[in-house]
Amino acid sequence: MEDFKVKLVELVSITGGLIVLFIAYTGFRTVYNASFNRLRHIPGPWINSVSMIPYARHMLAGTTVENSVRLHEKYGDVVRISPNEVSFISGETAFPDIYGFRTGKLKGHLNMEKDPVWYVKPSNGSPSLLQANDEDHARGRRVLSHAFSERAVAAQEPLVQTYVDQLINGLKGATAEKEGEGVVDMVSWYNWTTFDIIADLMFGEPFGCLQDLSTHKYVAVLLESFKSLRILYVLAHFPWLKYFGNLFLDQRQVQKRKDHLSWVSTQVQKRRDRETTRPDFMTLILANNGNKGSKLTDEEINSNAFLLLNAGSETTATLLSAVTFLLLKNPRVMEKLKQEIREKFASYEEIQLPTLNTMTYLHAVLLEALRYFPPAPVGFGRVVNRGGEFISGHFLPEGCIVSVSQYAAYHSSRNFKDPDAFVPERWHVPREKEYADDKRSAAQPFSYGPRGCLGRNLAHAELRIILAKMVWSFDLELEERSQDWLSRCKVMRLWVKPELAVKLKKVIR
């Protein structure tokens, strides 16, 4: 009994000692981060300078962008958002300084590496363009870029049009029983369309979402996996939580994501076995793999197929949902767009890319939607190089994380007049006088520099075709339950969106 008491006293003493050490360490880190840290000259809330907890809390709640907007409104162009992370909204200078090509004043500087917290290698161990180092990224981009050139997109248009026609016909079918009127969830319909398009371009066959009018199981896995990214981020910044990882991460979801990559690899092999020359991604990737010394391994092709499937679908669908909502909340803009589209095309069959590419108001509407509701709304962190770097006139020491907070930059009056108004006219060439001082280069929704989005041409093509055919075919009205749709969207690195209930009425000609 005495031995037990002695051991109990020892255990209590050790536990108490550990608690005291933890409190002392926490106190030391708090004083250091607030008073002596190398980022102490960067403005921001005191609590953000000493702890990751506030930032992690917003990450878990899905309120990062709202918080970023508030911080920049209060503290200015540059804000310390965590003990080792700094956010910028001075996009005109910060984008080139952080993400740009190393030319001109930056000649001789290395590209800043990505914040490794956000870029975890696929389960097969082979990095895609997203995680690759500079050398491997350049090698992979030389191979993959052929699938996204303007010439390639022009050849892919008939395939894209096939699925857009399925979308329009499906919506007509969904409203047929009510004399051409009905209410649908456009978030689901846009997701089905963009995922079917990207799957056919990648694998030679769609997911079948538009055919089945349901979300394929691996599309559902992808959409759910966005929510787990925030948890991985928090676990990375609080290492002691990794011992409780199973309590925070749904291991079934982790396994499903591994199964998804395995399924993608199988689909890639099936597509390669067909040996067809249709103008899809795989034809162009395989035709150029090995040219000029740039060659991807089979596993790298699989990893990049997984990336393209994800990046080339959900973000496009997000923008389509957003622009639909914004048009319906801004009747003046909708009427002007409707007039341009319906006067330009006498028939549905005439709606083709060569003509769509000349339509200035359609283009301005999409640019304004990308500014107002960027599909990737957060900052993509980069690690400052050895010796430190000047970013937008501020010196940042090596090892700290820097980024441009996209949503906050695009909704700042420092960059745009009436930033919370949906005004496509700000993108007109020549500029509208009222918006002549807008810093349009502060908006880079497809990112910037050597790591800029590879699929920009395809995204613009899909957006133009889908939006034009929707506006030509239907009159749209926002249902009461979706009047606050945008405010109910949350950011889990990408947007997590609720139902967008829209009443459609087929246009009779």
UniProtKB/Swiss-Prot annotation:
**The organism of origin for this protein:** Penicillium crustosum (Blue mold fungus)
Q: Does the keyword Transmembrane apply?
A: yes
Q: CDD domains from the xrefs? A: CYP60B-like
Q: Where does the protein end up?
A: Membrane
**This protein's name:** Cytochrome P450 monooxygenase traB
Q: What keywords are assigned to this protein?
A: Heme, Iron, Membrane, Metal-binding, Monooxygenase, Oxidoreductase, Transmembrane, Transmembrane helix
User: Could you say which residues bind heme here?
Assistant: C453
Give the membrane topology: Single-pass membrane protein
Q: Which GO terms describe its molecular function?
A: heme binding; iron ion binding; monooxygenase activity; oxidoreductase activity, acting on paired donors, with incorporation or reduction of molecular oxygen
The Swiss-Prot or TrEMBL record describes its family as follows: Belongs to the cytochrome P450 family.
Main location as per UniProt: membrane
Give the metabolic or biological pathway: Secondary metabolite biosynthesis
Q: Which InterPro entries match?
A: Cyt_P450, Cyt_P450_CS, Cyt_P450_E_grp-I, Cyt_P450_sf, Cytochrome_P450_monoxygenase
Gene Ontology BP, a term? mycotoxin biosynthetic process
The record's function comment reads: Cytochrome P450 monooxygenase; part of the tra gene cluster that produces terrestric acid. The clavatol biosynthesis cluster cla and the terrestric acid cluster tra are both involved in the production of peniphenones and penilactones. The non-reducing PKS claF is responsible for the formation of clavatol from successive condensations of 3 malonyl-CoA units, presumably with a simple acetyl-CoA starter unit, and 2 methylation steps. The esterase claE probably collaborates with claF by catalyzing the hydrolysis of ACP-bound acyl intermediates to free the ACP from stalled intermediates.
- GO CC list: membrane
Q: Which EC class heads this enzyme's classification?
A: oxidoreductase
Q: Name one Pfam family in it.
A: p450
Question: What do mutants without this gene show?
Answer: Completely abolishes the production of peniphenone D, penilactone D, penilactone A and penilactone B, as well as of crustosic acid and terrestric acid.
Which ranges does the record mark as transmembrane?
8-28
Essential cofactor(s)? heme
Q: What is its EC number?
A: 1.-.-.-
